[in-house]
A protein has these predicted regions:
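Glycine/threonine-rich phosphate-binding loop and adjacent beta-strand/alpha-helix elements that clamp
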Residues: 386, 690-714, 724-725, 729-731, ...
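N-terminal export/assembly segments and adjacent metallocofactor-ligating motifs
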Residues: 199-467, 493, 498, 638, ...
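Long, contiguous, secondary-structure-rich segments that constitute the structural scaffold
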Residues: 208, 721-771, 857-859, 863-873, ...
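N-terminal leader/propeptide and maturation segments of large enzyme subunits in energy/redox metabolism
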Residues: 292-308, 465-521, 711-809, 846, ...
Length: 973
């Protein structure tokens, strides 16, 4: 093959990966190429290529088929991580610079894109052909050989293999054959190529890529950029909210390292934070706006422009709003982005300006404890600042694993200091978690959903031993005894009489609780006495034990313990509940007033899709109206994976969303083709935090704000949700109101920051530009102690409850007259708990937990983190032995809702009778249905997505998620 033949072939391949229509025109005009492709060559119709050809092309190379991934970039082909814009990309760019090549930026692709590599080789050939002496020619020949060996050979072979595997098209297979011939693995051309059928291939210079170099000569070398440091911060729903330094060069991310944050704050990232670039700069990114062309869930789309995406959304919104009213519109729960300019705020503001939308209350994280806390204290803010833990004499971490979940960037360091001081730390959890290993003096395993029984028995013991704080109970609470009851509630329904069996005939002794919880009675007595005697003592719950079918009652039981012992509102104590701390005000994107008054529990959105018009205040605890007037017909699902992956009973949700007569439009944005995005009608490829400026608030606790500075430009054709809603708001004539009269996103963010700073001068926020350089730490902040004012001055500061006191017994709950919502705290067995007769069929309990390698579903695509912490089912040796299972076996976990096939870890770090599976793995269904009768209509998940097995059984009061209350069986595959 001579150099002109190679140049011609490389020009053809450049055109193929750049503009396929131009390529086909070239082929059609060159007899040799036309002969090679023969009848397989696509034919033009009305000046365009056939739609089926263009769809097939986009499926292979543009990401419109969710099941096809071909790595098209040297960085992804030459590493195990599949990262974009890494050191490999930088090497490619610097090679371009050395020889004066100006990369084209083909369709938003990174510079090491396969088409760009082919074009660079064309450029080098053109430079060689332009050279007048052999020495100069050899420079460019050597450069081409070295570049090919270092980058293009592997990239081309990987791409050719991907084409051959994913496509049956003879035309595409011949393209793959041409690539294999040009870049043979063993040095010999593959048979049946254009070089065999058309030796001496050549065509006119104007069809050769970079042919202008023949006249102009090589471009001068370009200077290399020096590396620089960008300070930024993560914005997903992570308990850490850390600060990181990004080393960038030539638009490539070379490293992420710890940044202590503004003013020396300890905001160091964990392994997740240091791997952000490996998560987000992944070749499987969504690349272009798309509209669904197949059935929902099939993952088949067609590429569209931003204008077409806005057109589609505008048309669907107008059509559905006109037909069903604003109550058919809904912004789904999702917190993949929690920064100031997060997309859910943008969407809510837009909808509120155009008629309103159905709203939601609560969160999947804590809705049940939120309800319990609000009814008991009249406020959600029941937590103390982490620093106050240093004042406690005794700590119970109840269903709490801050070593993994972080729970505020300061929490882990404070707990480490507390342990070093010698303060006793107890952890109550079905699992021997990371926090047990790192912090606990004692691990108390407990059967899931029985925490309320343990709380009852501890309260009974404390009262029986005379360790209760009677002054606190009488002064600040109602409901502990008959003499202190809220108005309208019979005196006999007090908590004391419940504990002592006067109400139901069952005394809540430790022996009673042992049979329910699996916790020995002596252990219950010991920790009850220790907790009550150690004042100040802190009972610090996590959120896992309230994500059960009886989660509200569990939370109320733990609150009752803190009040019984007088540990509320004092340094070193703790009020339990949902635990949020009101430290400093935080900026937010104002959604404005929603003209539509209907509000549902965040967990009930699928019910609102199915039968929203039947949902009522009494039955479904909707707010704002007595009965909804519409089903959900339009969903914005933005930066969230709750549409499928994180909602209970995935197979039920899939079936519901596949019925397009129910929800008629789903417009969604994300960085990846997540399981939820596969069910979208409109797909918007969003930029990651590494590509966009923003402002980040701390997670739950924190005296600071963090700047989020873009490290690189948005990859591919990423669409900022702000730009999308800007265009949409212009279509509906509300842009000025929506944007606060700001012309663009950057100025809007600055406006919101400066408005917030002006509203809160005591925070001492710096000018915007200086803030974006380093962020800001607030000065002189005192630790927040929940309800300290009410405890110090009860006559001046009253609780925001009907009685003005802590309502251990609630008149509001009594008025509901629902046996599943008692007026007093107390253990209630729940569906699929350990006492459910269904255990005869599905004998094992299954809980989820937060793994250290993921933040919900974020990072599940990160190969490095998966290697560090693979997805496994935890099962106790006793349960494994009964089923012939050994460590590392692939097992099937199943119940009537579905099945999962995954490897197991046989470990005594889980209670007998209980299994555990980390939440957040991306739902990946098998293409086959399981053998046998169990769940035969549903394909098994192959990645360990726990919500295949969780049930849609809303809790009685909050109508929240019970996703840690599941019964399953496990068998060896």
């Amino acid at each position: 093959m001579n150099i002109r033949e190679k140049w011609a072939a490389l020009s053809l391949l450049t055109g193929f990966f750049d503009e396929p229509e131009t390529l086909v025109r070239i082929i059609s005009s060159v007899p040799a190429f036309k002969e090679y492709f023969g009848p397989d060559l696509p034919r033009f119709s009305n000046g365009s290529l056939p739609e089926d050809f263009l769809l097939a092309y986009d499926d292979l190379f543009k990401g419109t088929n969710a099941d096809i991934y071909i790595p098209l970039w040297a960085s992804c082909c030459l590493s195990d991580t599949g990262c974009l814009l890494d050191h490999t990309t930088l090497e490619v760019i610097r090679t371009y610079h050395r020889y004066g090549y100006i990369h084209k930026g083909m369709d938003g692709n990174p510079p090491d894109y396969i088409g760009e590599q082919f074009r660079f080789l064309c450029y080098l050939i053109a430079c060689c052909e332009n050279s007048k002496d052999e020495a100069s020619k050899n420079i460019f020949r050597k450069a081409a050989d070295e570049f090919t060996a270092r980058f293009t050979l592997v990239t081309a072979r990987r791409v050719a293999a991907g084409i051959s595997f994913h496509s049956d098209s003879p035309f595409f297979k011949k393209i793959a054959g041409l690539m294999q011939a040009l870049f043979p693995a063993d040095g010999r051309p593959a048979p049946d190529t254009v070089f065999d059928t058309a030796p001496g291939l050549s065509f006119s210079e104007d069809l050769l890529e970079c042919s202008e170099i023949l006249k102009s000569g090589p471009n001068p070398p370009a200077a290399d950029e020096p590396p620089r440091i960008i300070r930024t911060s993560g914005r997903n729903n992570c308990g850490g909210k850390c600060a990181v330094k990004v080393t960038v060069c030539e638009g490539c991310i070379l490293d992420l390292s710890a940044d202590c944050g503004p003013d020396g704050l300890e905001l160091k990232p964990c392994l997740r934070g240091l791997s952000y670039h490996r998560t987000y700069m992944d070749g499987r990114r969504l690349r272009y706006p798309m509209i669904r062309r197949g059935k929902r869930g099939e993952g088949l789309f067609r590429r569209v422009s931003l204008k077409e995406a806005v057109d589609y959304t505008e048309n669907m919104l107008r059509k559905l709003t006109s037909k069903y009213g604003p109550g058919c519109r809904y912004v789904n729960y999702g917190f993949g982005v929690t920064s100031l300019m997060g997309p859910n705020g943008l969407a809510s503001r837009f909808l509120n300006l155009t008629g309103g939308a159905l709203g939601y209350y609560g969160s999947y994280s804590s809705i049940n404890s939120e309800a319990a806390t609000a009814y008991t204290y009249g406020s959600y803010f029941s937590g103390n600042s982490p620093e106050d833990l240093l004042n406690t004499n005794y700590l119970i971490l109840w269903a709490h694993n801050p070593v993994s979940t972080v729970f505020g960037i300061r929490t882990r360091s404070v707990l480490s200091i507390l342990k070093a001081k010698g303060t006793k730390i107890i952890v109550i959890d079905p699992r021997c978690s990371e926090s047990v290993k790192a912090l606990a003096d004692e691990w108390i395993p407990i059967l899931p959903s029985t925490d309320g029984a343990l709380a009852d028995a501890m309260a009974y013991t404390i009262w029986s031993e005379g360790l209760e704080d009677q002054h606190f109970m009488d002064t600040y609470c109602v409901g502990f005894d008959a003499e202190h009851m809220p108005e309208g509630v019979p005196k006999e329904l007090n908590y004391h009489d419940y504990l002592y069996g006067i109400i139901d005939g069952t005394v809540k002794t430790p022996e009673w609780a042992e049979k329910i919880t699996g916790v020995p009675a002596e252990t219950i007595r010991k920790i009850a006495v220790e907790y009550a005697s150690a004042k100040p003592a802190c009972l610090l719950p996590g959120l896992g034990n309230q994500r059960t079918g009886n989660g509200e009652q569990t939370a109320r039981g733990l609150i009752a313990l803190t009040c019984l012992t007088g540990n509320v509102g004092i340094p070193g104590g703790g009020a339990a509940g949902c635990g949020a701390a009101l430290e400093e005000p935080m900026p937010f994107f104002p959604a404005g007033t929603n003209p539509y008054k209907g509000v549902i529990s965040c967990f009930l959105w699928t019910q609102a899709v199915e039968e929203g018009h039947k949902m009522t205040r009494d039955k479904d605890h909707i707010l704002g109206m007595d009965k909804l007037d519409a089903d959900i017909k339009f969903i914005f699902n933005l930066a969230g994976n709750t549409l499928i992956n994180q909602h209970s009973d995935i197979n039920r949700t899939k079936k519901l969303l596949q019925d397009e007569s129910k929800c008629e439009c789903i417009a969604a944005s994300d960085v990846f083709m997540t399981p939820s995005m596969r069910f979208a009608d409109l797909v918007l490829p969003a930029p990651s935090f590494l590509e966009e400026d923003d402002i980040n608030m701390p997670w739950r606790y924190g005296h600071y704000l963090l700047a989020e500075n873009a490290a690189v430009k948005p990859v591919f054709c990423s669409v900022s949700e702000y730009d999308f809603f800007e265009e949409l708001s212009k279509r509906f004539g509300v842009f000025s109101q929506w944007s606060d009269f700001c012309p663009d996103r950057a100025s809007h963010m600055k406006y919101l920051y400066e408005h917030f700073a002006a509203m809160h001068p005591a925070l001492g926020l710096p000018p915007f530009d200086r803030f974006m350089d380093r962020g800001h730490a607030y000065k002189g902040s005192e630790p927040f102690i929940a309800f300290a004012d009410q405890i110090r001055n009860p006559d001046i500061y009253r609780f925001s409850t009907p009685s003005g006191k802590i309502e251990i017994v609630s008149g509001s709950l009594y008025a509901m007259q629902d046996p599943d919502i008692p007026a007093h705290p107390g253990y209630l067995p729940c569906r699929e708990g350990p006492a459910d007769p269904l255990r005869e069929k599905y004998p094992l309990q299954l809980i989820g937990f937060h793994t250290i390698r993921r933040c919900h579903t974020v990072h599940d695509n990160n190969a490095l983190l998966e290697k560090a912490d693979p997805q496994l089912l935890w099962i106790h040796p006793q349960d494994a032995a009964a089923r012939g299972i050994i460590d590392g076996d692939t097992v099937r976990i199943f119940n009537e809702r579905g099945g999962i096939r995954i490897r197991c870890s046989v470990t005594d770090h889980i209670m007998p009778g209980v299994t555990a599976l980390a939440e957040g793995a991306w739902y990946t269904p098998s293409r086959e249905t399981p053998d046998g009768n169990e769940c035969s209509s549903f394909p098994d998940d192959l990645r360990g997505s726990i919500n295949v097995l969780t049930g849609f059984y809303p809790t009685p009061l909050a109508k929240g998620n019970p996703q840690h209350t599941n019964l399953v069986e496990v068998v060896k595959c």
